[in-house]
Structures are given as C-alpha cells and as structure tokens.
C-alpha cells in the first residue's frame, strides 16, 4: 500500500470527528471531551500538512487523541480542577454507563483507560491499540487486561 496525499482537512475532520469524540467522552468524561477534542484537532491541523495517507489516518488521529487525553489527566492531577463550564452544545455519550462503572473507568491509570476504551468501547484490534499507545502489542494486551482486572475489582 503506497502513500498518497491525505484528503483536505475539513473532510478528514468530518470522517473522523465522531470517532474521536466517542473515544474522548469515555476517556476524559463528557465535561472535558469538547476541550480535549479541540486540542486534538488543533494538534492534528498543525501536523496535517506533513502527513502522508498510508490508509491509517484513523490510527494517527486516535494516537493524537490518546496523547492529548493523557496530557489532560496529567494537568488535572497536578493542580486543582477548575469547575467545568457546561458545553454550549450537548455532548452525546456513546453509550450510557452507570455512574459506578463510569467512575471506575475514570479512576484507571491513563494508558489502561485508553486501552480499555479502545478495545471494549470502540472495538479496536490490539495492533491498533499498540500503535495508538506507542507500545508493543503485548503491552497493549497487558494494559487492557490490567484495566479490566481493576474494573472487576472496583465494580464487582
């Protein structure tokens, strides 16, 4: 598979925006998903002129989204969390989760949370999870496994 010039950014955004938002709603929560979404696509826009489309742009944008989500969690952990402003538009949760499960997912370490969300919410294969996390497939499997174990212990 050769590389080619990627589609215009607007089309790229419309093709992948919903997938990224779905991922971020679970990865960082509804209250922060819009902000992290904007940060993700600003980073992508800056890098986009240098990107070659090898058929894996979906993995590329999810890698940016996962790193932006991890950065978000680091910022939150460093200092007091400001009270989020309600979004101007409603953020649609991909699937309703009960509060206990949502809290348990939010409490997972960032890489485990991202791995579990990609595997069990977005149904992504382990090789893609590894690529998004910048790890090996074995490490991706280990993050999913450890995350699920923690969820079972917390939720019961």
Please describe what each predicted stretch is.
Residues 66, 70, 133-156:
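DNA-recognition helix of helix-turn-helix
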Residues 3-7, 11, 79-106:
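Acidic, proline/glycine-rich intrinsically disordered inter-domain spacer in sigma factors
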Residues 35-42, 55-67:
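Structural recognition of an alpha-helix C-terminal capping motif at a helix-to-coil junction
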Residues 2-11, 21-39, 49-55:
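Short, charged helix-capping/linker segments at alpha-helix termini
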Residues 31, 127, 138:
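Residues within helix-turn-helix
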Residues 49-53, 63-84, 94:
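Arg/Lys-rich amphipathic alpha helix in sigma70-family domain 2
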Residues 115-119:
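A short pre-motif secondary-structure segment
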Residues 17, 21, 41, 109, ...:
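C-terminal flanking helix
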């Amino acid at each position: 598979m050769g590389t080619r010039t990627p589609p215009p950014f607007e089309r790229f955004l419309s093709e992948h925006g919903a997938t990224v938002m779905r991922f971020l709603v679970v990865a960082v929560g509804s209250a922060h998903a819009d902000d992290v979404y904007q940060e993700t696509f600003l980073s992508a826009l800056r890098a986009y002129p240098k990107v070659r489309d090898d058929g894996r742009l979906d993995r590329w944008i999810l890698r940016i989204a996962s790193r932006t989500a991890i950065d978000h969690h680091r910022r939150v952990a460093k200092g007091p969390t400001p009270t989020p402003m309600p979004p101007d538009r409603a953020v649609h949760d991909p699937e309703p989760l009960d509060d206990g499960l949502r809290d348990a997912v939010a409490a997972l370490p960032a890489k485990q949370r991202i791995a579990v969300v990609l595997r069990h919410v977005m149904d992504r294969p382990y090789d893609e999870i590894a690529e998004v996390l910048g790890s090996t497939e074995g490490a991706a499997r280990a993050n999913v496994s450890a995350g699920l174990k923690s969820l079972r212990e917390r939720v019961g």
